[in-house]
Amino acid sequence: YENGTERVAGAIRSRKFDEYDQFVNVQGDMPDVTPECIDKCMWHLKNYQVTTVFTEMPETMQNDPNSVKLVRAGDQALWFGRGMTGYGDWHLGVYGYKKNPLHLYHILNVTKEERVEKLEQLRWLKSGWQIGCLSVYFKGIEINAPEDVDAWHKNYQ
């Protein structure tokens, strides 16, 4: 599998989870994800087939290509990117899905934008799906580089 969504979709196709209608995917680089992040993703599935969460992006992260920026209109994601935008919210690596979109994910085209940005959620957007997004309080650390691991350990000593 190339990304977390493909892994979750693969698990769904194995039919081991037939009794469930909703799923959550927490990216491995987000060790500080809180229950609130997961709960909001799942709660917003009443309005959308695919959901995610975000928080205010610290200014120091705006130009960091490892930090994913979310551009949105209200509670709907318009774009995700790694570029130096100087604006955008901090996209946190938590996704909620209803079952049907996961069954379809493997037939959606991998786009140039997804390959360049290395962001799986762009496949949804470029295929015409809407992604719902909700704000959460988050002051954790995202692990993107070895120095992030050191910073995370310092927070928990």
Residue ranges, per PLM feature:
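Conserved alpha/beta core of the MobA/IspD/sugar-nucleotide pyrophosphorylase nucleotidyltransferase superfamily
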Residues: 90-157
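Conserved core of the sugar-phosphate nucleotidyltransferase
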Residues: 33-111
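Short beta-strands and strand-loop turn motifs
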Residues: 23-25, 51-53, 132-136
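Short phosphate-binding loop-to-helix
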Residues: 1-26, 30-43
